[in-house]
């Protein structure tokens, strides 16, 4: 994933860009630290293929009644079942959550790549978004797919020829893939979209309806004085010891813990 976002490459570090933060542009003034606000949260929003109804759509319909009052929606992972493949996005994400997508009424012809949301929709990848199929499983799933569709089983194993490409499909849908930009376009892109400022660093500006890419597979944003951390726990490993950002992150953690104790 680091290659996809050009992690800490000179073009970004020389501009002081923090690739783990984003600032959300809001239509109205953000509420203050003492003000209440609402947000939506969901996870594991999929299943295998159902013939007569769509569990993801039923979830989305329950959330729709609260959409207009919510500041943002957090998705805690397993965005697209069963294996996060590109051909599963239409029925398992685009169709169910079309009201959150710009031009969502055109979901049938919409690509899963470079999605744009009309309201902050902030996911992290789950294990299903990283799934890949071994060759034997892919062959069995692919060869039996026409038969399974013909039989119209009530509940089917939603798998075909492909998996997620080790999260590549998720990345194409939600993450700002800087590796896809030619070097001549990269500078313009960074100046246009990484123009927000946070504690002395530049970061990605999230603009609903325009640019709703995420800077990384894990990230942080702030709303009404509340810091929200989105962590991809699929790839957690033993810490490598001291890092350049370690002291500042430890300081931020101590400050947050102190605030919690004082409230």
Q: Which ranges hold each PLM region?
A:
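Acidic, histidine-bearing metal-coordination/catalytic regions of metal-dependent phosphoesterases
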Residues: 1-72, 87, 91, 95-125, ...
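Short glycine/proline-rich turn/loop motifs
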Residues: 45, 73-76, 230-241
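Second-shell loop/turn segments in exported
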Residues: 46, 78-83, 242-245
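Short active-site segment of divalent metal-dependent hydrolases/proteases
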Residues: 47, 80-81, 129, 227
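Conserved hydrophobic/aromatic beta-strand scaffold that supports enzyme active sites
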Residues: 218-220, 228-230, 255
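Active-site-proximal segments of metal-dependent phosphoesterases and phosphodiesterases across multiple
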Residues: 235-254, 258-263
């Amino acid at each position: 994933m680091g290659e996809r976002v050009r992690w800490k490459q000179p073009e970004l570090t020389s501009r002081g860009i923090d690739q783990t933060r984003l600032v959300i542009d809001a239509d109205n003034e953000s509420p203050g630290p003492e003000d209440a606000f609402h947000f939506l949260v969901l996870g594991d929003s999929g299943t295998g293929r159902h013939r007569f109804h769509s569990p993801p759509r039923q979830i989305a319909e329950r959330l729709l009644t609260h959409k207009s009052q919510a500041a943002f929606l957090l998705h805690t992972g397993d965005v697209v079942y069963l294996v996060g493949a590109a051909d599963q996005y239409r029925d398992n994400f685009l169709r169910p959550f079309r009201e959150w997508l710009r031009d969502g009424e055109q979901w049938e012809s919409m690509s899963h790549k470079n999605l744009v949301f009309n309201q902050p929709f902030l996911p992290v990848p789950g294990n299903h978004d990283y799934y890949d199929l071994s060759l034997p499983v892919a062959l069995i799933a692919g060869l039996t797919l026409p038969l399974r569709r013909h039989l119209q089983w009530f509940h089917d194993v939603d798998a075909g020829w492909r998996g997620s490409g080790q999260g590549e499909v998720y990345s194409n849908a939600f993450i700002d893939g800087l590796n896809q930009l030619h070097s001549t376009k990269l500078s313009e892109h960074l100046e246009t979209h990484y123009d927000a400022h946070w504690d002395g660093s530049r970061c990605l500006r999230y603009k609903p309806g325009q640019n709703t890419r995420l800077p990384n597979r894990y990230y942080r944003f702030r709303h009404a004085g509340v810091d929200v951390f989105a962590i991809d726990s699929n790839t957690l490993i033993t810490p490598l010891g001291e890092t350049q950002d370690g002291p500042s992150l430890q300081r931020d953690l101590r400050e947050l813990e102190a605030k919690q104790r004082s409230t």
